[in-house]
Design a protein with these regions (language model features):
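Solvent-exposed serine/threonine-rich low-complexity stretches and specific carbohydrate-binding patches
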Residues: 383-393
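Exposed beta-strand face motif in extracellular beta-rich ectodomains
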Residues: 408-412
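Short acidic/polar inter-strand loop motif in beta-rich domains
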Residues: 350, 416-426
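Short amphipathic alpha-helical segments embedded in low-complexity Lys/Glu-rich regions
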Residues: 65-70, 108, 283-305, 417-419, ...
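Long acidic, serine-enriched intrinsically disordered low-complexity regions
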Residues: 436-462
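C-terminal helicase lobe
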Residues: 1-81, 88, 124-125
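Short, hydrophobic beta-strand segments
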Residues: 389, 396-407
């Protein structure tokens, strides 16, 4: 059946497996970020040595033309690897991901590199975030920036899907000037907002939406870390977006919609009974405390099973926390010097009751545990002075270090921000009278000495 001259040719394909090539060269930035952040790579030579242990290195000589290796000699291979590694490290340095000291050949990971490695975010996405996020970025901007992440380029685009996306886009509140229906980033932009609006979607788009949601929280957490590292208080907006993503609600929606079976009608009934949030609903559902309990239950129109579901949410899931704090030496706070605040958070539980940290999120595709951010900020200057991410069990005691840059009286806010529930945040304020720092005193003394010297020079001239 097969000519003898081609027999060996076909036997090769039957007897030998097809080669699987490496694509590490396309993702080397991400690999280096992970290894540099964990201190596995600390120099250029470490990076070159690391690359020799990869499958990419094994395939280089086996299929050099695929990787653009022109000279397969030892010197040619060494030169190829050195150039590839040095170019990659230079890109990371220019993106302010690492600090590269060429004199002693050391590589130091910078904060963006640590963020990218911790949240498993690509180098290109981190570049986008670092260039786009600033003190003026608001909710719309964060949604646009997050959905521009390269992680969403894997979203499938189907034929005639643009018509459905167009109809969804007409119903969502946040618009952009460049509405490209053939872009995976625009699709992510539309489907994320559809999630906030709790829209019913076709099964294919629902699967795409799940893919988007599974990656959104890490991207938002990275936005929080980037903005907070720059001292921008609008990091709170990214935290609120995290809550919106988990609960499938807009920031303008009632927090009561987190309660099972609470639709617009039930929310309207609750509002008419002067119930605006989940905590007020908890109080109102106590028949011993609320004389109008019977009318409220009747007007809500929920069945006994639905009321039981609502009670389970308020009793077992929605957090009830007591936040208290104590300033350390408030009278000795000086500008530019570290100051401290002791924080205590107590969860309202019975003695024999264990804290439930599992989040009630029926619209979120994966299970999630409850986490919180503690933030010290100043609203008047939009400054974030301290931040810590914590998990709160039965109780938590911790200390935050903050630095106020300017002397004078400052009204600061201690924010306790949930990453998953809307309406559970707390934001008590406190005042600090900040004295002049040592640097300021030294500057004043230097100015006085300069003035005295000038005066002496004038006297000598006379």
């Amino acid at each position: 059946m097969v000519p003898a001259i081609k027999r060996n040719y076909y036997k090769k394909f039957l007897n030998e497996a097809l080669p699987v090539e490496s694509h590490l060269q396309s993702y080397l930035h991400d690999a280096f970020v992970a290894e540099i952040s964990t201190k596995m790579i600390g120099s250029t030579q470490d990076a070159i040595d690391w690359s020799t242990y990869t499958y990419f290195y094994r395939r280089l000589l086996a299929n050099p033309s695929f990787y653009g290796l022109l000279d397969t000699s030892h010197e040619g291979l060494s030169s190829y690897l050195s150039e590839l590694v040095e170019t990659t490290l230079k890109d990371l340095e220019e993106a302010k991901m690492i600090e590269l000291d060429e004199e002693d050949d050391t590589i130091t990971p910078l904060n963006p590199s640590m963020i990218a490695a911790y949240y498993n975010i690509s180098f290109v996405t981190m570049q986008t975030f670092l260039l786009s996020l600033n003190a003026n970025t608001r909710m719309k901007g964060i949604i646009t920036i997050v959905t521009s992440a390269t992680e969403f380029e894997e979203i499938q685009l189907r034929r005639h899907e643009d018509q459905i996306l167009r109809r969804i886009y007409d119903r969502i509140p946040v618009k952009i000037s460049d509405s490209r229906y053939d872009s995976p980033h625009f699709k992510a932009f539309v489907l994320l907002q559809a999630h906030f609006s709790r829209m019913q979607l076709p099964i294919d788009l629902t699967k795409d939406q799940e893919f988007i949601l599974q990656r959104t929280l890490n991207l938002l957490s990275a936005c929080v870390d980037i903005l907070s590292s720059e001292g921008h208080l609008n990091a709170l907006k990214a935290m609120e977006l995290s809550q919106m993503t988990v609960q499938a609600l807009w920031d303008r929606d009632s927090a009561l919609k987190q309660i099972p079976h609470f639709d617009d009608r039930a929310v309207k009934v609750a509002n008419s009974a002067k119930i605006q949030d989940v905590y007020e609903f908890m109080d109102a559902m106590d028949p011993d405390e609320n004389p109008d309990y019977g009318n409220l239950v009747k007007n809500l129109g929920l069945s006994n099973k639905q009321l039981a579901d609502a009670a389970q949410f308020t009793n077992n899931f929605y957090p009830r926390l007591d936040l208290s704090f104590d300033l350390v030496d408030p009278g000795s706070v000086t500008a530019g010097a570290p100051a401290y605040v002791n924080i205590t958070v107590e969860r309202e539980l019975d003695e024999d009751e264990e804290p439930n940290l599992k989040v009630h999120a029926p619209f979120f595709p994966v299970e999630k545990s409850e986490n919180w951010w503690l933030v010290v900020g100043e609203e008047s200057s939009d400054s974030l002075l301290a931040i810590k991410r914590v998990t709160i069990g039965r109780s938590l005691k911790t200390k935050l270090e903050y630095v106020v840059p300017d002397a004078g009286k400052h009204t600061l806010t201690l924010y306790l921000m949930s990453d998953c529930y809307i309406g559970a945040d707390q934001a008590p304020t406190f005042e600090v009278d900040v004295g002049e720092g040592m640097d300021d005193d030294d500057d004043d003394e230097d100015e006085e000495e300069d003035e005295e010297e000038e005066g002496n020079d004038d006297d000598d001239g006379e």
